[in-house]
Structures are given as structure tokens and as C-alpha cells.
């Protein structure tokens, strides 16, 4: 039996624009992804006695989850059929706009794909079958994604403020599918693909002036998001404050570590009803 321990980092959408809808009702998105040092941990046992995916601190089905779906897809393209069991230690908030399930699936795809020498293009195709955020999570680097998550542009030279605090209302969660199903706006955001910035300052201006198109829908289900964003935007030295993904997690981004730490310390003292993480962009 072989045992592997792998990390799955959380993602944050610095902006998220909805630019249209396909006939199958999937939405076209354009989003700037970053990944932060808040991780789920996956203990992967290969050729052991057990099969399935086990979550140490959440009640999630061991067969009906993104990690198990990814394993089943990978096994169809492998010459071996080992027993695989995974114990997932969840640190990323569930149903919170941080792509925890997608990150976990991407982590197992990376591990088994490399182990079984599966082609990188095929891995990306399989990742998209698991979920629209999984191809981006497979990269786990700063990137711009468009379409339904399949079209990715890596941005290795983009220098961003690195220090971030994540804030979510305690005990609240939001289903991604629920939020998208209630997104009824037909006045979609204009695509920015033909005018993506080249210069660093232009990227910073784009990020600052962008938004999350899912915010209004999320507010209908978790109105506490509005107060969180109001407080975050008032923090000293904050660059931007915004909701990530389909919510309900929000973030505040800072240039200096001390500014982020002071802000998080203040929030922990004054808002015990919020879950707060200090993090750094990878």
C-alpha cells in the first residue's frame, strides 16, 4: 500500500463577470483567479483494502463527491484498477465560493494523472467534466479563465497585492448551482478578452474597477454579505474588497502584511459572528 499526502489550495476570484449563456443554460464567465495558502489536505491510500472518499470533519457522501468522481474518470484511462481511498481534512469552508470541492478534485487529478502518465490535455478535459472550476484549480496559479472554465491564460508575471483576509458569515453556506439558477439577468457584462491588459498598472486598474456579477443574487440568500463588504471596504489601506465566487465568502486585499494582520485582528475582536482567515496569494 502506498500513501500520499497532497494539498488543495483555495481559490479566490478577484473579479467574476458573466458574459452570456449557452443553450444548455451554462453561463459564460470571465474571471481572474488567484490561489491562497488555505488548504484542504488529502491523504491518498492506493492499493489498500478500502475504497471511497472520507471527510474527517464534514458529513459528505463517500461516493457522491467531486474527488470520487475524478477518481472514477481517471480509472477509465488507466491500465491499472487499484483500490483507492482518500481521507480529506477540510480547512476550506464548504459551499463558500472558495472552490473547496474543485480544489480537492484537482489535487487527486494531479497526483494520479502524474502517477499514471496521463496526457496533460486529457487531464484538463477530465477536470472540466468534474466541474467548471476544476481546470483552474488543476493549475492553482494566477490565471484568467473564460468560457465555462475551459479556456485558461496563465499570468505568471502579474504582480498583485499578496496579502488577503477571507471573511464569511459563520454558519452560512451557498450552493453554487442555486446561485447560478437564480441569476436571471439578461444584461450580461461585456467581454474584456479583446482588451486584456499588458501593463501591470492596467491590470491593477481593471481589477479595481471590476466586480462580481453574482453578488446581487447571493445577497438574496445571505444578506449578511452586504454588511461584510461594507466593513471590509472601510478598512484602512485596503486595495479592494469583494465577494468571491458564488459567495458567501468575501475578501479584502492588501499590499502590506502588517495591514492585513491588523485588519484581521480588529475583525476577530469585534465580529465573533464572522469566520476570518489570514492568507497569502501563492
Swiss-Prot record:
- Keywords noted in UniProt: ATP-binding, Isoprene biosynthesis, Kinase, Nucleotide-binding, Transferase
According to its UniProt entry, the protein's GO biological process terms are: isopentenyl diphosphate biosynthetic process, methylerythritol 4-phosphate pathway; terpenoid biosynthetic process
Which terms does the record give in the GO molecular function aspect? 4-(cytidine 5'-diphospho)-2-C-methyl-D-erythritol kinase activity; ATP binding
EC number annotated for this UniProt entry: 2.7.1.148
Q: Which domain of life is it from?
A: Bacteria
Active site positions, chain numbering: 11, 133
Q: Which InterPro entries match?
A: GHMP_kinase_C_dom (IPR013750), GHMP_kinase_C_sf (IPR036554), GHMP_kinase_N_dom (IPR006204), IspE (IPR004424), Ribosomal_Su5_D2-typ_SF (IPR020568), Ribsml_uS5_D2-typ_fold_subgr (IPR014721)
Pathway listed for it? Isoprenoid biosynthesis; isopentenyl diphosphate biosynthesis via DXP pathway; isopentenyl diphosphate from 1-deoxy-D-xylulose 5-phosphate: step 3/6
Q: Which Gene3D superfamilies match?
A: 3.30.230.10, GHMP kinase, C-terminal domain
Which PANTHER family does this one have?
Answer: 4-DIPHOSPHOCYTIDYL-2-C-METHYL-D-ERYTHRITOL KINASE, CHLOROPLASTIC
Q: What does this protein do?
A: Catalyzes the phosphorylation of the position 2 hydroxy group of 4-diphosphocytidyl-2C-methyl-D-erythritol.
Mind telling me which NCBIfam families this protein's record contains?
Answer: ispE, PRK14608.1
By sequence similarity, the record places it as follows: Belongs to the GHMP kinase family. IspE subfamily.
Name the record gives this protein: 4-diphosphocytidyl-2-C-methyl-D-erythritol kinase
The encoding gene: ispE
